[in-house]
Amino acid sequence: YLYREGYIDANPARGVAPAKVERKLPQILTSKEVELFLEQPECTDAKGYRDHAMLELLYATGIRVSELIALDIGDLNLPAGFIRCSSSKKERIIPLYHGAVKALQDYIKGVRPQLIADTEETALFVNMNGERMSRQGFWKIIKHYQEKAGIQKDITPHTLRHSFAVHLLENGADLRAIQEMLGHADISSTQIYTHVIKNQLKDVYQKAHPRA
């Protein structure tokens, strides 16, 4: 202020690097918590089959909620076991595990035709009125199953995305491959998950080592 107003000749703050803001590590679910969460939808009616397919797909691919609800039926290639995800920047091809393929097949063949209001509807996931699922609608679904599972962590759609990345890293996946699947433009966005794993190891050490 003093320099800008002309009270002093030099700016003493010039060249001083701004303080680094510590990046908060994302919250993730353990593998057991994910399994419990994915078990919550009951495949006894249309809603249960749809919700099960959505949650399996979200964890199988790590896509964003905006990408999930934007998926069209033509973005799936279930025989080959992958989905095509088109973001604003580029297209990604992401593989699916068998359980996600099965959940999607059950939904598409047996449930989606009952839900869509218009046979020309292209949306993969629709609400109970037959229209494309909204972010708010999916958020409510996530919260419902969090409460049903009794998981104390605050689960959001992004929690499954974070968990997807960390679990792949824990099991030896290449960081660049994870970056590609997540659609990160910068590898530094993906590297944050390595810090999560380091923190987990430190917690395990502190709890288990007799001299910690």
Which residues fall in each region the model found?
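Conserved catalytic core of the tyrosine transesterase superfamily
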Residues: 1-212
